[in-house]
A protein has these predicted regions:
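Surface-exposed acidic/polar loop and edge beta-strand patches at domain peripheries
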Residues: 1-138
Length: 138
């Protein structure tokens, strides 16, 4: 397994990194620290040595990710799914949330975890696996 981390140039001049992982069987994937967005999943094409194909539906570049209002391929939160009428009660306290999909609150609101830059805390490489720990303090 091989890991490559590099800074990504982007029009917003944000400190975004990409993490690219390759194995010996010609599989690879790439994700960004911006929203934990999974950018590519490349698999070998049968009977075509050293050729791969990206099988992930997504944006072609970081600009598409930055401009998107979507959540797919990203870390979502603080909640996953929809909170009806953008409000809830907990321990007899009532909370009103931002209705980013009126009248509901979806996947963390106006600026969810998909729009945050995550910090790479640790990358652990082994012969047959990779572990990447990221964090975001909110």
């Amino acid at each position: 397994m091989k890991v490559k981390v590099e800074k990504i140039d982007n029009p917003s001049q944000l400190n975004i990194e990409s993490v690219e992982v390759h194995n010996d069987n010609n599989f690879s994937f790439k994700f960004y620290t911006y929203g934990g967005y999974i950018h590519e999943v490349n698999i070998p094409i049968m009977n075509q040595e050293d050729k791969t194909e990206d099988v992930l539906l997504g944006y072609g570049n970081i600009e598409g990710v930055l401009e998107s209002n979507g959540y797919f391929n990203s870390i979502i939160g603080r909640v996953a799914n929809r909170i009806g009428s953008a409000k809830f009660s907990l321990d007899k306290n009532h909370y009103q949330l931002y209705p980013n999909t009126p009248p509901n609150h979806l996947h963390g609101g106006k600026v969810g975890f998909n729009k945050k830059i995550w910090k790479i805390d640790n990358i652990e490489e082994k012969s047959n696996s990779i572990k990447c720990v990221m964090s975001y303090l909110s």
